[in-house]
Amino acid sequence: MEAEKETEQEGNLTVMKLPVLPTKPNTHSHSMSSPIHSSISASVPFSWEEEPGKPKQHSTSSSSSSSSSPLTSYSSSPFETHKSLELPPRLHLLEKDGGSVTKLHSPITVFDGPYSMTTSKRMDSPSFRMMVKGSADCYGSFRSDIDGDLEDLEVGSKQQENLSSGSLAVVKKRGRLGFFGFRRRRALKGKTEFGRGSYVFPSSVDRESEYSRKEEEEEKEDKRFGYDDTDGISCSQSSRFCDVKISSISRTGSFSTLPAPPSSSSKSHFWTNVYAGLKQVVPWKSKKTTV
């Protein structure tokens, strides 16, 4: 009875079977001609192609242009909008002002910077300039403004203040007359700039009109004081320009007051005294000869 019940229970149970998956061999043909997914990559054409490997054909282009590379045919397309490069900021300023950009500035404006629209012919950066004119005139300066605003500096009482504060001081240098009324050579004309560190630099020489004007003023002053360009100038007139005190040399003695040179007898007396002193200090031994 028990065996029959077991067979009935087994018949009522449903047997679940696992699905069998189809097995495929894991073999790939690694050929160098085409990749694994060649169909997917070939279906995406480039922007200048209608289909992969087929460039776009244009009715306006000739047969010679159609036979050229796809890049040139795409660039000559009338339907495409070409994007040009943007102008630099300094050219944008010209367009805003209503000017044309047909003629660009010369490369000299590189010194003024990319955003500077000034038309200055000289660079406004600190520099040292040196120029030699004539036989003895030498000029040079350390200045940031070459055109120069040194005319506005005061001469006189501000000289000591400028030297103490470390700034440049402008001193008017006459250099007309020397000692005893003789005319000395003027090596430095115009103005002289004094800087700290015991460096002396004469001023710049781009002022020919200024020098000529100074020459005329000096000539007028010479005529006003009563002398001309000749060298026959009195010492009183030269003292107007150079305050020089010449101390007189006083003679404190003469050749008669000098002691007379010692005679030969005094010399011999001196050496005898020296010899006597040496004999007292150094013991002298007399050599006795034995017979």
From Swiss-Prot:
Organism ancestry: Eukaryota, Viridiplantae, Streptophyta, Embryophyta, Tracheophyta
Residue ranges with Low complexity bias: 28-43, 59-78
Protein name in UniProt: Uncharacterized protein At4g00950
PANTHER family cross-referenced by the UniProt entry: DUF688 FAMILY PROTEIN, OS01G0551000 PROTEIN
One term of GO molecular function: DNA-binding transcription factor activity
Residues covered by region (Disordered): 1-82
Transmembrane segments: none
BP term (GO), one: embryo development ending in seed dormancy
Superkingdom of this protein's organism: Eukaryota
Pfam family, one: DUF688
